[in-house]
């Protein structure tokens, strides 16, 4: 019998918990959280919705509409967090600065945060925002996994070449700790690999092994 990834059922039952403008409005800091970050228009909300098989994360034709930390409950101990998108020119500078302060406070203080999924548009990877997130994750010892989103926008060969190029750049600058994969929400490409990362961070891998038959 083929194993069913243990995180899949939890993601499919994900429900919205709350939105927080600052850290003291977040849920109790216990259990397991995985946060999703990405520059505006990197496909973050689409990736979250595909992973949860639902329309949980807000999508918009205007990037940067997500201004809050949005928490989604998987079970009593596990949550996904949609972080504010950054970099869209139409967002006023004071609002960008407000987002940045509270994002830094969340990332720097959250004990339950077990890993960070960073979305990069495969056509425009390694932006200044991406480099800052990589620097922070490696310096703080936070596990990071990168989704090169919108991989369906390129031919498979071009997507694979970009993956190898970015992977090489990351290894040279940040070491082996950061992992990376191709991802496409509309084509459902890379789901199993992403689920495996989530299951490991949320300590569900052993439960998957128990289900083997």
Swiss-Prot record:
The gene is engB. One of its GO terms (molecular function) is metal ion binding. GTP binds at residues 38-45, 64-68, 82-85, 149-152, 182-185. One of its GO terms (cellular component) is cytosol. CDD domains: YihA_EngB. Residues 30-204 form the EngB-type G domain. Necessary for normal cell division and for the maintenance of normal septation. Its cofactor is Mg(2+). Keywords: Cell cycle, Cell division, GTP-binding, Magnesium, Metal-binding, Nucleotide-binding, Septation. NCBIfam families: GTPase_YsxC. SUPFAM superfamilies: P-loop containing nucleoside triphosphate hydrolases (SSF52540). One of its GO terms (biological process) is division septum assembly. Mg(2+) binds at residues 45, 66. The keyword Cell cycle applies. It comes from the Bacteria. The keyword Glycoprotein does not apply. This is Probable GTP-binding protein EngB. Gene3D superfamilies: P-loop containing nucleotide triphosphate hydrolases. The lineage of its organism: Bacteria, Pseudomonadati, Pseudomonadota, Gammaproteobacteria, Pseudomonadales. PROSITE patterns: G_ENGB. Belongs to the TRAFAC class TrmE-Era-EngA-EngB-Septin-like GTPase superfamily. EngB GTPase family. It comes from Pseudomonas fluorescens (strain ATCC BAA-477 / NRRL B-23932 / Pf-5).
């Amino acid at each position: 019998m083929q194993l069913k990834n243990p995180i899949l059922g939890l993601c499919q039952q994900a429900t919205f918990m709350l939105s927080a403008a600052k850290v003291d409005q977040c849920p109790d800091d216990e259990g397991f959280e995985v946060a999703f970050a990405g520059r505006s228009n990197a496909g973050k909300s689409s990736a979250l919705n595909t992973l949860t098989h639902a329309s949980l994360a807000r999508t918009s034709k205007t990037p940067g509409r997500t201004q809050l930390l949005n928490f989604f409950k998987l079970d009593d101990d596990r949550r996904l967090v949609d972080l504010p998108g950054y970099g869209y020119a139409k967002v006023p500078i004071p609002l960008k600065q407000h987002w940045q302060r509270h994002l830094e406070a969340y990332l720097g203080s959250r004990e339950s945060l077990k890993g960070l999924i960073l979305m990069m548009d495969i056509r425009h990877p390694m932006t200044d925002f991406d480099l800052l997130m990589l620097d922070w994750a490696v310096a703080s010892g936070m596990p990071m996994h990168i989704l090169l989103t919108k991989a369906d926008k390129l031919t498979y060969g071009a997507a694979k070449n970009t993956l190898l190029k970015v992977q090489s750049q990351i290894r040279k600058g940040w070491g082996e700790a950061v992992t990376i994969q191709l991802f496409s929400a509309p084509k459902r490409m890379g789901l199993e690999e992403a689920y495996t990362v989530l299951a490991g961070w949320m300590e569900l891998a052993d439960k998957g092994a128990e289900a083997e038959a």
